Structure formats: structure tokens, C-alpha cells
Design a protein with these regions (language model features):
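Ligand-binding clamshell of periplasmic/extracellular solute-binding protein-like
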Residues: 1-4, 163-167
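Active-site phosphate-binding/coordination module
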Residues: 1-59
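Short beta-strand scaffold segments in enzyme catalytic cores
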Residues: 6-11, 104-105, 169-170
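Glycine-rich phosphate-binding/hydrolytic loop that grips phosphoryl groups
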Residues: 34, 165-170
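Gly/Ser/Thr-rich active-site cleft segment
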Residues: 45-165
Length: 170
């Protein structure tokens, strides 16, 4: 499966939505990106992230949520992308797929791991524990649960793979 990249889907410890998703076209976090750019943070992390900063990325949205919706931020257990949220609903397993997270400015794409130094530079170091385990695109991340099967018509036990970031799937 694939889904749009970036934006943010937040779930709590019970795997329930914390708030409505914020899509990647949302610009509410523009001032954070402007501040980080002026301070040289974007240039400093670019060798690891290989990304330009923009307001619809999870780094900016997490900083905005921390400051403007602290209750939602505190209740968040997992930060997910669109298809990772769909996969969670199908399998009951929280995971993030590597190609999707590579566009978030939350990880070092050279090591294919989240980088706490990058998060610290954005002032969201405490979000590190909200990032789910990374999985590869073709990796089986779980199976369709009986509840998801009843809701979707899919066969229970159907394997569900990691999927691909929208741009990479094209």
C-alpha cells in the first residue's frame, strides 16, 4: 500500500487517534521552519536528513503541537504517517516504514535510523520515544486482525507489508 507522505497521524497508548490528522499541505508550523532556517538548523541537519525543511513535515508539526496542543502532544504514544496509520488499523501493530520516514527530517538517511541529535536541534528531543519501530517496504508488519477483516471485507490473517512513500511508489 502507499499513502501521502509527511503530515502527521497521532495515536495514544491504546492505539486510538489523539486528534484529527494534519496533512502535509498544512502550513500552521511555518514560523518554526522560518526560525530553524534563520538559525541554520536546516543546513546543519541536511547532510543527515537530505531534506529541505517545510511546514508539513512531522518535525515542524510536532514542535507546533507541543506548543499549541500540549495535551495532545503528551497523550501521543506513536507518530505515524498516513499508510502507517492504515496499517496500524489493519494489524494493531504500530510501525513506521523506512521510505516514508526518510522524508520527515527525523532520521539520518545514511544510517536508516532515527537520530536523537536531529530531534534535539528541532527542540523535540522528547519526541524520540514517540517514533515507532522502522520497517522496510516489503517487510511483513502484521496480519489483518479479525476486527479489521469484519470492517473491510479482507480475509483475516492476510499479511500486511510496510508499503511505500507516495513519491517512491511512482
Amino acid at each position: 500500500c502507499t499513502g501521502h507522505g509527511n503530515g502527521i497521524y497521532l495515536v495514544d497508548a491504546a492505539l486510538q487517534s489523539v486528534r484529527n490528522a494534519i496533512f502535509s499541505a498544512d502550513a500552521r508550523a511555518r514560523s518554526y521552519v522560518e526560525r530553524w532556517t534563520a538559525a541554520g538548523i536546516g543546513q546543519a541537519v541536511r547532510p543527515k536528513t537530505m531534506q529541505s525543511l517545510w511546514p508539513g513535515q512531522p518535525n515542524a508539526l510536532l514542535a507546533w503541537l507541543r506548543d499549541h496542543e500540549p495535551d495532545a502532544y503528551a497523550r501521543t504514544r506513536w507518530v505515524l504517517m498516513c499508510k502507517d496509520f492504515v496499517r496500524l488499523r489493519l494489524t494493531g501493530q504500530a510501525a513506521a516504514e523506512l521510505t516514508d520516514m526518510s522524508g520527515t527530517s527525523l532520521m539520518d538517511v545514511g544510517t536508516a535510523q532515527y537520530d536523537p541529535d536531529i530531534l534535539d536541534r528541532f527542540g523535540i528531543g522528547d519526541a524520540f520515544d514517540k517514533l515507532p519501530p522502522l520497517r522496510r517496504s516489503a517487510e511483513i508488519c502484521g496480519e489483518v486482525t479479525p476486527a479489521a477483516a469484519a470492517a473491510t471485507g479482507l480475509a483475516p490473517g492476510t499479511p500486511v507489508a510496510g508499503g511505500l512513500f507516495d513519491v517512491d511508489a511512482c
